[in-house]
């Protein structure tokens, strides 16, 4: 972890990065699941559900990016592998 002077101890920053990586992992896996449903939706409500799921995964993408960037700003490293996502995820 690189040194960052933002008024938090290294322990506090490490704890925050750990939590952010958990959020990042859950968000990424949720995005994958949402895209899968988006691709597979059928039926009379196809258009509205398809659009809703697209909006959701686009919002998740923004959240994922912000979470990863915040982790870096705290001096940590955002998880970025399938193995890492599965390690930290709770969904």
Per-segment meaning from a language model:
Residues 24, 77-91:
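N-terminal intrinsically disordered, cationic/polar leader segments
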């Amino acid at each position: 972890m690189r040194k960052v002077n933002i008024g938090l101890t290294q322990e506090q920053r490490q704890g925050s990065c750990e939590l952010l990586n958990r959020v990042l992992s859950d968000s990424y896996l949720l995005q994958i699941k949402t895209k899968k449903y988006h691709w597979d939706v059928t039926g009379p409500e196809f258009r509205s559900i398809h659009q809703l799921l697209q909006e959701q995964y686009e919002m998740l993408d923004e959240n994922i990016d912000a979470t990863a960037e915040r982790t870096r700003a705290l001096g940590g490293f955002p998880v970025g592998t399938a193995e890492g996502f599965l390690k930290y995820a709770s969904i």
